[in-house]
């Protein structure tokens, strides 16, 4: 497999390097996930909102069957789209487990803070109790959203907060808060959807290490300790994105990359929502 693991606050080891399936064309999702698994990816990230849980699951099952890989050796993440309360969320958990066909989901996240997050969280806790979910967390939550959840005295503390993270978007207040609570950060859109390719400083650092801009941004997130979820539907780039474990960015260059921060969000940013 590619990369190492991060230990979550519930004791589980989660592969740090993941394949992100957001915005992967549905006609290409199965093949792209299968290609990622062939390249050594062992963490696949999906969501109800992506409408590809079934395609991801089929690719994982095919890979398991053809290689003899055990279910416990592949980590599957998905996310709840509609936070409509306890009963609705219980049904949504069942729907996701059925859709992926994997028997259980390793990590299930509240996709955003919008909706009834407290009651929906209680349903996720029930999913863990019933063995349908192994770990639970949140996505796009700001410190105030998480604190509200913690103030409700949950049985389970969120394991992960998945937010947009890359050199141009440090979200340091969110990172600092989560780290103070033992919540693992996961970086989506680590490549900024390509919107910052061509940046002179990024290009200079990429040239120095004889790596692509994408590889530098992925490596940056890994060295920050984040779970990282690069996305591509091109087999060559899927492989290239994983070729980031044969070098290390120096402390000086990590600081240069960090200083590129301009609070640039390539996607939505519910972290700042007052609701």
From Swiss-Prot:
Its main location: cytoplasm. One of its GO terms (cellular component) is cytosol. GO terms for molecular function: aldo-keto reductase (NADPH) activity; D-xylose reductase (NADPH) activity; L-arabinose reductase (NADPH) activity. Its EC number is 1.-.-.-. The record marks 79 as: Lowers pKa of active site Tyr. It is an enzyme of class 1 (oxidoreductase). The keyword Cytoplasm applies. It holds the Pfam family Aldo_ket_red. It comes from Schizosaccharomyces pombe (strain 972 / ATCC 24843). This is Uncharacterized oxidoreductase C2F3.05c. The active site is at 50 (proton donor), 111 (proton donor). InterPro entries: AKR (IPR020471), Aldo/ket_reductase_CS (IPR018170), NADP_OxRdtase_dom (IPR023210), NADP_OxRdtase_dom_sf (IPR036812). CDD domains: AKR_AKR1-5-like. The keyword tRNA-binding does not apply. SUPFAM superfamilies: NAD(P)-linked oxidoreductase. Keywords: Cytoplasm, NADP, Nucleus, Oxidoreductase. GO terms for biological process: arabinose catabolic process; D-xylose catabolic process. PROSITE patterns: ALDOKETO_REDUCTASE_1, ALDOKETO_REDUCTASE_3. It comes from the Eukaryota. NADPH binds at residues 45, 139, 162, 191, 196, 232-233, 237. Belongs to the aldo/keto reductase family. It is found in: Cytoplasm; Nucleus.
């Amino acid at each position: 497999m590619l990369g190492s693991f991060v230990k979550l606050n519930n004791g589980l080891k989660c592969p740090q390097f993941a394949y992100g399936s957001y915005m992967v064309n549905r006609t290409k999702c199965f093949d792209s996930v299968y290609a990622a698994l062939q390249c050594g990816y062992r963490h696949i990230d999906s969501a109800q909102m992506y409408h590809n849980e079934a395609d991801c699951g089929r690719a994982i099952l095919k890979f398991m069957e053809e290689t003899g890989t055990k279910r416990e050796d592949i980590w599957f993440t998905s996310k709840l789209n509609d936070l409509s309360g306890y009963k609705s969320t219980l049904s949504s958990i069942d729907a996701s487990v059925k859709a992926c066909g994997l028997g259980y989901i390793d990590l299930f996240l509240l996709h955003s803070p919008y909706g009834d997050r407290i009651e929906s969280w209680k349903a996720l806790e029930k999913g863990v109790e019933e063995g349908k979910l192994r770990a639970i967390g949140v996505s796009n939550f700001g410190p105030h959203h998480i604190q509200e959840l913690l103030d409700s005295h949950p049985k389970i503390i969120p394991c992960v907060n998945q937010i947009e993270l890359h050199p141009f978007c440090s979200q340091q207040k969110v990172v600092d808060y989560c780290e103070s609570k033992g919540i693992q950060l996961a970086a989506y859109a680590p490549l900024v959807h390509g919107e910052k390719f061509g940046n002179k400083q990024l290009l200079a650092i990429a040239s120095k290490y004889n790596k692509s801009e994408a590889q530098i941004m992925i490596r940056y997130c890994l060295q920050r300790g984040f779970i990282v979820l690069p996305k591509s539907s091109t087999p060559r780039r899927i492989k290239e994105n994983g070729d980031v474990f044969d070098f290390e960015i120096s402390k000086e260059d990590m600081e240069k990359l960090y200083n590129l921060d301009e609070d640039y969000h390539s996607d939505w940013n519910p972290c700042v929502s007052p609701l």
